[in-house]
Amino acid sequence: MSNMQQKTDVILIGAGIMSATLGSLLKELAPEWEIKVFEKLANAGEESSNEWNNAGTGHSALCELNYTSEKSDGSIDIGKAVKVNEQFQLSRQFWAYLVKRNLIRNPQDFIMPLPHMSLVQGEKNVEFLKKRFEALSKNALFQGMEFADAPDTLKKWLPLIMEGRNSNEPMAATKIDSGTDVNFGALTRMLFDYLKTKNVELNYKHSVENIKRAKNGLWEVKVHDMNSGKIEHHTAKFVFIGGGGGSLPLLQKTGIPESKHIGGFPVSGLFMVCKNQKIVEQHHAKVYGKAKVGAPPMSVPHLDTRYIDNKKALLFGPFAGFSPKFLKTGSNLDLIGSVKPNNVLTMLAAGVKEMGLTKYLIQQVMLSHEKRMEELREFIPNAKSEDWDTVVAGQRVQVIKDTDAGGKGTLQFGTEVVSANDGSIAALLGASPGASTAVHVMLEVLEKCFPERILEWEPKIKEMVPSYGVSLTENPRLFQELHASTGRTLGLNEKEAVHN
């Protein structure tokens, strides 16, 4: 019946990696809780979590240069890199816990060992990379990293990239074999298959139209069943909005004070994919370069081996694009619809501040296939246009908010949890490092929204995620033990990953 209210304990909006992770944690911590999932699309993991809609990097700051900045005194700040790496370790540990208990199977279908490399050109950049390597090498989380600036070593490490390179410009690379390629789409589908066995109600082709607080304090969620055309009303004590780019409009509908003065700026991504399997087989790594001066952090170019549908692929990008949609399957009215009286000044301030980003996006949108090939040839000098196609990746909505440090309308490059003061509702906003840190971010949701249960849950959390609440940097022996044990469980035999 359309007007009948259906009660439950927890509602998860969006069937992506975040809801899948939160649902899996809750089913282990509070198995008696009833959970319902509502997803607008026909299957799980079809938007940002889909394997073609993200880079599939197990982000652990092994190769991403934007996580290590050079300070004014010339030293390297590795704080952000350590933080991202520690967060990825939590994900590894939780996935290993699930595999060990046969709750999900065949880890090779969602995670593969793959060297992570950084590559730079030019004297200044080589100097930066050497300093970065020296700074990271002192930390246990980055053990095993190698540095090379000798052409012979670079040719061995990067045959495809070094072939046909005539420039005498200095080049250098770092390599670490403990990197990973993660198929977040496959992982998301596995987690929802597991949740189904735990009697979690999965509702596909169900679009959430509104979220409002009922008089009894529960959250009332209005859902459009796209299969039958009927409207349903569901109530829950706790709601999580994990709808990727679609989270901001839903958060705004809640009316909670924490949702005010927040805006979103959508950026679309394009990748070039190689269709010549002979070329694909000549590369075996994720190789990250350095963003061009003035380009935003999400524009770091990288040439990636990927494992999609158990087949090796080669992708280069990202190229940014602009679309007013908040989701790949969204509406052209998403951006304008998100402008409210409480955030219009924040949005306008960002517009003025981010003229450089706007100019960059316009330039990116105007690029022809041949212009994109020119950028690719900076990585692969011999690349041929006919070997490469362009694929459209997912939409990312960067958060805009007022901050003490940046002032009004500051663009945030990161992932952020916004929750009500009483912890009854939470939403995940933002982009990178995103899926890689899903376990860390969902544990943050539990801490913010269930503070009264955390002490009781802590032993179980530590069983699932042994380094929860512990700094692995300060406990190198624990890191080595956990890295080795999770590697065994997940089938990440690093030596097999080294390119011959």
Swiss-Prot record:
Read off the Pfam families from this record: Mqo (PF06039)
The catalytic activity, as recorded, is: (S)-malate + a quinone = a quinol + oxaloacetate
Enzyme class comes to: oxidoreductase
Please provide, alphabetically and separated by semicolons, the GO molecular function terms listed in this UniProt record: 2-hydroxyglutarate dehydrogenase activity; L-malate dehydrogenase (quinone) activity
On whether Plastid is a keyword of this UniProt record, the answer is no
Would the keyword Transcription regulation turn up in this protein's UniProt record? no
**Record's keyword terms, sorted:** FAD, Flavoprotein, Oxidoreductase, Tricarboxylic acid cycle
Swiss-Prot/TrEMBL cofactor(s): FAD
The protein's name is Probable malate:quinone oxidoreductase
Q: Which organism is it from?
A: Bacillus mycoides (strain KBAB4)
- The protein's gene is named mqo
